[in-house]
Curated annotation (Swiss-Prot):
Organism: Eryx jayakari (Arabian sand boa)
Disulfide bridge partners, by residue number: 127-194, 172-223
Protein name (record): Neurotrophic factor BDNF precursor form
UniProt function note: Promotes the survival of neuronal populations that are all located either in the central nervous system or directly connected to it.
UniProt-listed Gene3D superfamilies: Cystine-knot cytokines
Length: 223
């Protein structure tokens, strides 16, 4: 599946409607620069700033993740969110993990990593996928680790009321190239098929005996 860039880190600055990033000037844009050399330097500075922000966010992620001694550590999942409304963006920690996995796999210097990004080289994924937030009301049921079908509860009680469970699911796209098999496979010699794969996440569920509890359930996570 294609990797998405994590959003920039927002910081407070003076001025109306201003959104700034560490080390980046908040006034002017690339169109107002004096010449092509300045534009090139501006783009390079922006790329360096982006990578610097990502590294800061990754460091913060390690700090906020629950430790092994925490009794609630097994409830941690990047694809599950408790919220009063539908999340507008993919989960930040999920994006950071994908970016970190890419950097670890690349095992290259920062500048080489940036220029080797598949998105920069115009590469395409083998299978096209789509990702979206799904509510428990839409899922209704799921399969747990024991193979039993359980009911996914729509709301989770919290001290100040209730929050809805949302799941960030990724599955193969029903449109386009996926119907013709995997991209890049020679169809003269090989048959291929894009399939949605699943992973386990922790969710509040109820079994057929009306017992409510946190269980690992399967959701669509990749193509």
């Amino acid at each position: 599946s294609c990797m998405k860039a994590a959003p920039m880190k927002e910081v407070g600055v003076r001025g109306q409607g201003s959104l700034a990033y560490p080390g980046l000037r908040t006034q002017g844009n690339l169109e107002t620069l004096s010449g092509p050399n300045d534009a090139t330097r501006g783009l390079t500075s922006l790329a360096d700033t982006f990578e610097h922000v990502i590294e800061e966010l990754l460091d913060e992620q390690q700090a906020i993740q629950p430790s092994k001694e925490n009794k609630d550590a097994d409830l941690y999942s990047t694809r599950v969110m408790l919220s009063s409304q539908v999340p507008l963006e993919p989960p930040l920690l999920f994006l950071l993990e994908e970016y970190k996995n890419y950097l670890d796999a690349a095992n290259m210097s920062x500048r080489v990593r940036r220029h080797s990004d598949p998105a920069r080289r115009g590469e395409l994924s083998v299978c096209d996928s789509t990702s979206e937030w799904v509510t428990a009301a839409e899922k209704k049921t799921a399969v747990d680790m024991s193979g039993a079908t359980v009911t996914v509860l729509e709301k989770v009680p919290v001290p100040k009321g209730q929050l809805k469970q949302y799941f960030y699911e990724t599955k193969c796209s029903s449109k386009g190239y996926a119907k013709e098999g995997c991209r890049g496979i020679d169809k003269r010699y090989w048959n291929s098929q894009c399939r949605t794969t699943q992973s386990f996440v922790r969710a509040l569920t109820m079994d057929n005996k009306k017992r409510v509890g946190w269980r690992f359930i399967r959701i669509d996570t990749s193509c």
